[in-house]
């Protein structure tokens, strides 16, 4: 639902706009506690203090389904992530969202890589136990220092052996991280996919940032950037898995353009 982030829309307004454009699914962002912009109706994030059944009512009213929840939290910081993810998994279960998406997050300034992997294993183990009980999947996304390469993302995926853990592949982050060929990477993880972020990267952003950053919050309209979406969709189809393409762009016009472009390829 990042497409309404610059339009001062509340969650319900974002759901209504998604339906108006033609989208079948949304991926809500959730947070702990209360914060001013969401409570005032100027931001789309949902507090997990809300009743998840009420959130589902809003979606049902507009005929919208939930593909997953955006629950990005630093796995390297268990004091933040363990309880947040466990609560998000329970919230997703009641809401009817099959997936919660996350990443390793910015690491603590003082830890070593070895320590970070121990911390991530602890966090993911705690989260996976709850996810297995509730039948929820955890989508690991390439977004930060360790997951920016195919080998790095795989190393995090292998930390915990659980049927609840899969991959939320982000095409834009895979490109910007510069850790390898996007399509070879997608091919290598296609059978682990539980969700997919349809994020395109403008040619200019690619020139300016590729290999210098590990990801970006949102991209340009799908079809306007560097990603070969026809090739991406062909790879996903060979996975024989039902995977939702969750568009990540920053404006309503880009969301409209992305929907129209991708719909022709599906």
Can you say where each PLM-predicted feature lies in the sequence?
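Active-site-proximal loop/turn and secondary-structure-junction residues that shape catalytic pockets
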Residues: 30-34, 72-75, 104-108, 144-146, ...
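Helix C-cap/helix->beta junction micro-motif
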Residues: 61-62, 95, 133-134, 163, ...
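Active-site groove signature of glycoside hydrolases
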Residues: 92-113, 134-147, 246-247
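Acidic/histidine-rich catalytic cores of soluble enzymes
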Residues: 8-9, 15, 25-26, 125-226, ...
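H/E-rich (His + Asp/Glu) clusters that bind or coordinate divalent metals
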Residues: 221, 230-233, 237-239, 243-245
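Hydrophobic faces of well-ordered beta-strands that scaffold small-molecule active sites
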Residues: 1, 26-28, 66-71, 100-102, ...
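A short, acidic, flexible beta-alpha connecting loop/helix-capping segment that sits on the rim
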Residues: 244-256
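N-terminal pre-domain/capping segments
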Residues: 1-99, 115, 121, 125, ...
């Amino acid at each position: 639902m990042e497409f309404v982030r610059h339009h001062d829309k509340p969650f319900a307004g974002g759901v209504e706009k998604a339906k108006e454009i033609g989208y079948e699914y949304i991926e809500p962002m959730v947070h702990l506690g209360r914060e001013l912009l969401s409570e005032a109706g100027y931001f789309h994030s949902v507090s997990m203090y809300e009743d998840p059944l009420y959130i589902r009512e809003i979606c049902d009213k507009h005929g919208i389904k939930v593909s997953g929840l955006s629950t990005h939290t630093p796995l390297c910081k268990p004091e933040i992530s363990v309880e947040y993810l466990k609560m998000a998994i329970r919230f997703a279960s009641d809401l009817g969202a099959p997936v919660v998406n996350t990443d390793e997050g910015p690491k603590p300034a003082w830890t070593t890589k070895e320590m970070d992997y121990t911390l991530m294993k602890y966090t993911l183990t705690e989260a996976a136990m709850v996810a297995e009980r509730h039948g929820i999947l955890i989508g690991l996304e390439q977004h930060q220092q360790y997951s920016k390469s195919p080998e790095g993302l795989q190393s995090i995926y292998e930390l915990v052996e659980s049927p609840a853990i899969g991959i939320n592949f982000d095409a834009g982050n895979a490109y910007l991280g510069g850790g390898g060929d996007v399509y070879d990477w997608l091919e290598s993880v296609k059978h682990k996919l539980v969700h997919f972020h349809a994020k395109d990267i403008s040619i200019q952003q690619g020139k300016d940032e590729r290999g210098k950053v590990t990801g970006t919050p949102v991209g340009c309209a799908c079809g306007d950037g560097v990603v070969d979406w026809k090739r991406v969709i062909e790879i996903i189809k060979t996975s024989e898995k039902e995977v939702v393409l969750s568009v990540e762009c920053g404006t309503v016009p880009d969301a409209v353009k992305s929907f129209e472009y991708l719909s022709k390829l599906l």
